Amino acid sequence: EFSRSQRVSQEMQKEIALILQREIKDPRVGMATVSGIELSRDLAYAKVFVTFLNVLTDNADPDTAKNGIKALQDASGYIRTLLGKAMRLRIVPELTFAYDNSLIEGMRMSNLVTNVIKNDVERQVNPGSDEEK
């Protein structure tokens, strides 16, 4: 059983994702995905966590995420207006955007595990070239 705030946040996540995909034309936003929403108990404030897929490329500018968040924050009033039209809420929450680095952190952890496994296999194949003597 879900509470009302959980249901509203799930629906908001879907709607904001659609709005970002269809309505926001700012090039700084690029390929943004909504990874989660924290909604206050009174539904007046929403913290929207976003991930930018163009940050995942190797040649990405380190400020890409910062610029994307700034662009979303600048457009938050427009996004809030569109959200109010899409959802039937008495009070449309005030939106703040935050960068969610869990996807990048997860990929980094996965690479670390892959490298450890690869090194372990190499040690089993070549036991004489090990540092431990």
From Swiss-Prot:
It holds the Pfam family RBFA. InterPro entries: KH_dom-like_a/b, RbfA, RbfA_dom_sf, Ribosome-bd_factorA_CS. The keyword rRNA-binding does not apply. GO terms for biological process: rRNA processing. The keyword Cytoplasm applies. Gene3D superfamilies: 3.30.300.20. Its main location: cytoplasm. It comes from the Bacteria. Transmembrane segments: none annotated. Keywords: Cytoplasm, Ribosome biogenesis. It is found in: Cytoplasm. GO terms for cellular component: cytosol. HAMAP family: RbfA. One of several proteins that assist in the late maturation steps of the functional core of the 30S ribosomal subunit. Associates with free 30S ribosomal subunits (but not with 30S subunits that are part of 70S ribosomes or polysomes). Required for efficient processing of 16S rRNA. May interact with the 5'-terminal helix region of 16S rRNA. Monomer. Binds 30S ribosomal subunits, but not 50S ribosomal subunits or 70S ribosomes. Belongs to the RbfA family. NCBIfam families: rbfA. This is Ribosome-binding factor A. It comes from Yersinia enterocolitica.
